């Protein structure tokens, strides 16, 4: 395929997605290349709706096939929170540390076995035709009592993956891309592209 727009200006996210799909497209853009689009209002009622909003708005503006993702961190003992508000759990215009600190405070005193959680990533694709679709990736884990590691972004330092025995923030990018919620969703996205376009 010729080109695609990743409907995000988050450098970490764009890099993670580009790493896995670069061989499928001759040119990959991000919202950094279309700054005039501005911030896309994510007012859906689910991560699926928010992802489709981003990919549709981006396609409508660029007329280039667009892919977007939205991710929720769902903590069982918090009834699925932060959920839809994962990126702004501690408020608007906050840092990753602000969000993690609020989460750790909310779970203060909760034993490890009750700190189960999952990352859920939904990726949507819009090309203006009949090929719009979505895929989902889920990574199960636990919320640590304190931050571990300095790699990655978002909640990675507090998300522990039992199968690997480490937090996402202590994994190399290769390992993380292989097992992460976004990595799983991107692999499903690539499979769907293969089916639709015989890439």
Question: What is each of the regions a protein language model found here?
Answer:
Residues 2-5, 11-199:
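Anionic-ligand binding patches
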